[in-house]
């Protein structure tokens, strides 16, 4: 079907014969970081082609010149339509997209942990059945501890992740297949042809050429400053600045500051700042034009020659291009003898400039979420040195509710200071309320806890609605510690329960006032040690009952004063002994004295001795 211009367009779709369709015209739109879009207007002698043989099937467009292949584009048919039928031909229309486009039809919410961005992207591509992809990376990209795809398509997530990491992608084509390539530097691009500048309209006989070229500069951001925060280094200012080196024609005062910068370490902060500056200045120095070079495509460059302005005769990197081709001969009854033509319009930046995409919208979590505390099998409490825990979110279909389900997540406490405050680690199986810093799904933080049907409150409700309780549960055992307050009128109570030991340390004074009765029951031993004096005052009676032995040891003096009577009743023996001193028993009118040498003195008004037998020696 080639005519005087030497151009010819052919197309092959799925398993259909090569002659099934003739190309009437096409438009191919390609750009960095975008799946290409090929719109084909076709003609066929078949009036009823099976849609199943076309839709979602491979499709390849070939551009020929004088029988030599100039360009190929292959993808899958995303839309197919049948139009009017003429005398000999039926019109059809097909939309062709790359396999990458399919990822825009897959929406998901999932968590990636401790992976580099290229590994995350590779996983998504492989899951979509795309195995023909490559990474041409020249810069180091840090492992992402926690990266969430949140309620966005796989394609949107890839675009966002690529933009954050300074990556861009484009397509390469081989016979019957296409490859998506991810790069992070202009040095990875394919060097393209030389194209001479020519204002005249002519064919390809002298080679492809550029027939229009316009260069523009725009005042843009001059400097980027990004700041973030890490709780691991709270006093360190994670602030990074990057100034453009191409500010000869504008002021340097246009600073772009943003917080948070989406980084937690200096190497990432430095790189992200540079990526952001490149993206914001992507339109600072640009070119656009028209040509008839079919080989122009994103991911490649061309060298412009013979332009009247020598400053433009250099390498240019293709950012976007739209090819248009017309082949009227495909409609034999309507062609009118018009020639086959091919032209394009393109957008470029300088070949040494690394183009980067603008930062896309990042999905935000609209409000708090519910999650379950998880950990390794056989454990009840699982945390790290910062008291962080692992979570399983209800929307995460990939997590196994174990210690790999999430990153370590910080927990808000009621009070947090330097080695003081309140701490209660949520335990495995607990339900918690999770908020997200700045709404960022990559930055969860536990801000609350809730009971639910299988984790009820310590006391049944609403029957115990007047109780305020702090009850714990013995770790890997049965039991609890508890501090409880009862506020029911007439039943007010403060209750303390210690499952095992209870220790109280008072560094100064302690006062206890009981207005009614006080009962203490000690099931084992009791020891009271008073370093100084002790005073016990009982205003009424005191009863002491000892069912075993009692031993009283007084290191110095002991004085007992009884203002009324004193009785001592002993069923067996009484022994009173002074080891080195005297013994004196006295009343108001006399006394009996025994000195340490054994001398006994009895002094009084009289002495009465009665007994069955009295021996005096």
Swiss-Prot record:
Show the PANTHER family listed in the entry: PTHR32305, TYPE VI SECRETION SYSTEM SPIKE PROTEIN VGRG3 (PTHR32305:SF11)
Q: What is the lineage of its organism?
A: Bacteria, Pseudomonadati, Pseudomonadota, Gammaproteobacteria, Enterobacterales
Similarity annotation: Belongs to the VgrG protein family.
- UniProt-annotated stretches for the region Disordered: 325-344, 449-469
The protein's name: Putative type VI secretion system protein VgrGA
Deletion phenotype: A double vgrGA-vgrGB deletion inhibits the ability of RhsB to inhibit cell growth.
Instruction: Sum up the protein's function in the record's words.
Output: A Vgr protein that is probably part of a type VI secretion system (T6SS). May be required for export of proteins involved in Rhs-mediated cellular contact-dependent growth inhibition (CDI).
The family database entries (InterPro entries) matched by this protein are listed as: Gp5/Vgr_OB, Gp5_Vgr_C, T6SS_RhsGE_Vgr_subset, T6SS_Vgr_RhsGE, T6SS_VgrG/RHS, Vgr_OB-fold_dom_sf
